[in-house]
């Protein structure tokens, strides 16, 4: 094989000057060389004085190339005016040199009043958006399709039909949500072109709303671009930036229901904006500080993150005029206070057949954008003369160009990533990233971006630890450009940034569908996309070559109470490597009194353990841990909880019992998916009333599983420590140190490392030593005594369930959510209750196991359905009033409400006394 050592020198004039390319080891350079002449090319780019990127040696894929073609990375060329776009779009997208002119002073209260009415959490350590590899970057995140209005049929429809439990319109959104949170944790400013997270409530506060108060010195703007109504007297307010705070605008909504709320802000961009406008979100648990560069992005909703707010008006968002940069304290730079949004709401854009009424995030992008851009934006940005279906294609890139202020920063400081899934007769598999067929309609470096993401996703899914289904399919071709895609058109996006569509898998293929329904795979796809974008940044700019990836979440947290009432928390590092992420260099531990809202956190200085004071002495303390590195901050670990022995007057009062809470859910898998029934045709009327599955790992992680058992034990005056099942199996904590163990596996199939043979041996020894055990879960009995393609129990599994515990699997309950006590049984005082929880992120409790008692065991709860239908079995003693164990064939956290669970726990503990 020949090796060429020639260099070819090219120059091309672009907006930034003359850029020179030195290309060595060049394949297919148009001189009749064989495609087999070389296997790699080394590319160096410079301006003559500054290296734009380090020399990169890239493998050359000759598939489909003629002997005289090669795709080279070239700098942005001088564009033709508007790239052929209509003049209205060119004008709408063009960055202007807008600056505020002195305006009428706004009526405002003294700044001291803002301090007097601020959240008490202002005095506690604040939380911050992490800094990381995407700090300073603006990412426009998109998810294809969604509920769309059909003018001819006058109905709303999904653009893709149901198949294998998946509707692409919703799966794309779930994928974007995961990606958005990874971006936020990596320091990015995220502009979602469909809403982030699931929150049907909404509160939108404009600067003129009664719930908005101004403090200090503000002025009225005369801008013609703003959020609100066409007749608003004051478009918005602005204040001069200063090193010390002299102006605050406070947006205090009435939150109708406690929950996790995405928070968005709307501010016009401009030349005189500060580079880091400060927003303080006072939510339950902490005050979080976020900075947005409104010289770079504006005129639409920018996502600040998602935060837990309690019902009422205790939470708020402040806009502050304080800046760190002394250059911006010059009397010329300003901060802007226009609108703040809490939650997503439901569809309310009018159409001839009415408003959709669907959860707004499930609608197509054009409706969110229409409600986002303000009264003076050109409606052609989000509409189409043809149909709403057409509008969903053009809206995202046009909106990105409209919101982006391209004169601030460089081409690589922003990017648009859109998520879809693919279909091709059920036969194709794998990830494909897209770029446009027409070279004239490709934003600069688009093919490179597509190739890097497509390669990364496929490679990581192949190499990731095996899932419980067929392996990821290796693809020869990881990109596709068979047509010119509207979402990616250069004229729509005005070449202000690069853009690609990531078709993460083929939803019409049964094997790929298994990946799409698995949150672990969805997380891998999002993380691989993140790394692919970073690779693209690094290929184009030398300063980006060292960018890292945020770590994975810490594993196996354990919370123990110490004799002096303090709390010891320990954990293990998350997996690190090219696939998972870079190693953590520090950890941050967060505490909560509720398990929902956490404080600002504290660094452990790299240690894998910490000792904390309890939040209160009479209620549980909840803890979670994150890992940090130069790439950002990981997702949080599992939540663990502890209730120390209660402290009295200088002496320790020991509660009547001590327990260990074990979270058996250690893996994200398809059992954590949420079912969704839509009483409306999807893309196909035959799908009416069918179930689609939503993959929402963040909702799953935040679900109140640990809280349910912790609150019930607290009501029974039982102190406890907690961990997950892997911590037990790996010897981090001993069962025999606790007289009572409550082991919960939720809806997860416990075959994947939860009740392994060694763990079963530990439980058997614990019971022989006189320990008391409560096992609960929807599929635990089926996994250990049933027979299905997904779960084939071993002989050890069956012996454990049948001989040690004295019960057997009898079938599956798919009908009844009502559970009743067996008359005369040990739980006869428990009131009849209903299995609930799907709306809380706990997942649908059905189907759940039906069990039967063996030997000296006895049935104590039954599903309210005809036939043999035991929902709980108790046993372990010849005394029918006391025993060693209780088995609940449903998740404890799904048992009715808080009062019901407290009564159920009290009766169970009475039996296990």
Task: Identify what each model region corresponds to.
Residues 538-581, 632-655:
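Pro/Thr/Ser/Gly-rich low-complexity, intrinsically disordered linker/stalk tracts
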Residues 747-844, 856-858, 864-866, 904:
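A glycine-rich, often tryptophan-bearing local segment used as a flexible ligand/cofactor-contacting loop or short
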Residues 648-652, 656-665, 675-683, 734-792, ...:
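Short alpha-beta junction capping motif
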Residues 247-271:
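A short beta-strand element within beta-rich, extracytoplasmic domains
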Residues 612-634:
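Beta-strand-rich modules
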Residues 181, 186, 194, 352, ...:
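Aromatic-Pro/Gly-enriched surface loop or interdomain linker
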Residues 235-239, 320-334, 339-348, 407, ...:
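Active-site-adjacent mobile loop/cap segments within catalytic or ligand-binding domains
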Residues 129, 135-143, 147-203, 207-218, ...:
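Catalytic-core regions of hydrolytic enzymes
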